[in-house]
Amino acid sequence: MIRYYQQQLADLKAQNQFRQLPQLIHRGRFIQREDNTMLNMSSNDYLGLANNEALRQAFFTQYQDQLPALTSSSSRLLTGSFPIYDELESLMAQAFGRETALLFNSGYHANIGILPALADKKTLIVADKLVHASMIDGIRLAQCEFVRFRHHDYAHLEQILQKNDRTFERIIVVTESVFSMDGDCADLTQLVALKQRYPQVMLYVDEAHAIGVLGEKGLGLAEQQGCINQIDILVGTFGKALGSMGAYVICDQVIRDYLVNKMRPLIFSTALPPFNVAWTHFVFQQLPHLQAERAHLAQLSQHLRQAIVDIFQVPMPSESCIVPYILGDNELTVRTAQRLQQQGYYCLPIRPPTVPKGTSRIRFSLTADMQVAEVEQFIACLQELAE
């Protein structure tokens, strides 16, 4: 029995796909691994809030010696519901201009729970080819009919809708707003227009990599494209730009009530710690005031994207602070990431099955606490690699 697993691991090593948990020490925007201190080019802390000491101290000052509980000790449907949860949900619903919001323990919990709760045998789920693994897992758990449309190919999506609009009672179209591996953005206005032509269609959008970063108030790509009110299921996470933990859905009250009664990861999980939810509440209140951080991040991102195009003469799909350098070959990608780490940059290889075969890459993630000079030095390092 054990030999089977040993052989599977040996195969992963032979394919340069073997993963190990790293031993890291975090020092602000830097990572220390063994004796090597590196600029962290792989973080999801897009606004730099997780390392913002002034923000942290302001939070503690607000609560002083009345800090929220460190654990909920139960699911929300039993004894694990605290006032701060309702306060955050109300704050978010008001900010988004929607009826309600609902919190979850993580983005993964949200994506594996919402779709199975909403779907049944009379439902068809249609997903962009490159949606996140958590959404794929949620679709599998839904046990309903499922097809994919080609990435960003909304003509292909409409063909699928035309073919199936009289066969199913409801069709759920699923996409990310900012895609996690390429950093490219969905055209949500096109998706909304399609939804409006097909009354049985619901639109499910995951804003994990857009919340905090995009939009005038930092509410994501849906805010930036002016279509928050037209998206039925608007999902996002607190564990990236907001420097916290957990996730949310913005939706109508009837959807919230349905999820509270039907969503298994919500019903059967211990709720987030109240302390964590209080921190998220505090950070979310700051989002409208972080325009300077968003502008700085956008400037850094544009500069790095253009540099990669110029240096390596490769196409650049990204429109965000997620900047891929696609090498293709697994071994070459691993070697290049190691060379960058030796030069003082914590860059990680992304390989199949996380990305499609033949598209192994290094995904650079920029954060708003990086300095222009640091990104300039990194670009100079990339230039040396190319020579």
Curated annotation (Swiss-Prot):
Signal peptide: none annotated. PROSITE patterns: AA_TRANSFER_CLASS_2 (PS00599). Its cofactor is pyridoxal 5'-phosphate. One of its GO terms (molecular function) is 8-amino-7-oxononanoate synthase activity. Pathway: Cofactor biosynthesis; biotin biosynthesis. InterPro entries: Aminotrans_II_pyridoxalP_BS, Aminotransferase_I/II_large, AON_synthase_class-II, AONS_Archaea/Proteobacteria, PyrdxlP-dep_Trfase, PyrdxlP-dep_Trfase_major, PyrdxlP-dep_Trfase_small. The modification N6-(pyridoxal phosphate)lysine is found at K240. CDD domains: KBL_like. GO terms for biological process: biotin biosynthetic process. Keywords: Biotin biosynthesis, Pyridoxal phosphate, Transferase. NCBIfam families: bioF (TIGR00858). This is Putative 8-amino-7-oxononanoate synthase. It comes from Pasteurella multocida (strain Pm70). The lineage of its organism: Bacteria, Pseudomonadati, Pseudomonadota, Gammaproteobacteria, Pasteurellales.
